């Protein structure tokens, strides 16, 4: 089974990418526990920023953008990790999903992971983002992983229980949704 990790984070260090990697690792373990072998492909949206802008302005997709879309289309499941900036996802998130459209995401099991700044996002934001994915005919799992600086601090202190539980629950939901999903 193929899991694509699409991360919309930028900057160094890349906390959104670290969150995505952590989630994908648990998804792979969940799949393995069910007897499935997972292959992972990573799509870093910050590397496609110029390609996404060109597509928005001229309607032309570069080779890199077409390859990213093809990777998502061929996936059995998708982990989407995006930073939350000023109570909304990053622009790369919106741009990439506009390119994908509903044909590519139809029926695709998706796990949404949000990396927040120092403040937690508005309570309804996860619902809004899940709604956007549903509007593209994707099949988002019920649990949304939300992590921020306090979670990174507790991880370094060795007390990551709550975040680990959310990741484990969401990963199990994605693995279960991926098993019957076939192209």
Model-derived regions, located:
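Glycine-rich phosphate/pyrophosphate-binding loop and the adjoining helix
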Residues: 139-183
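Mobile beta-alpha loop/short-helix "lid" or hinge segments that flank ligand
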Residues: 41-52, 134-154
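A short helix->loop->beta-strand "cap" motif at the edges of active sites that frequently abuts
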Residues: 36-37, 105-109, 138
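Short, glycine-/small-residue-rich phosphate/pyrophosphate-handling segment
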Residues: 110-149, 161-165
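P-loop/Walker A phosphate-binding loop and immediately adjacent motor/lid segment at beta-alpha junctions
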Residues: 23, 27, 95-111, 117
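N-terminal beta1-alpha1-beta2 submodule of the flavodoxin-like/Rossmannoid cofactor-binding fold
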Residues: 1-80, 84-94, 98
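Hydrophobic alpha-helical membrane-association signature
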Residues: 19-23, 125, 170
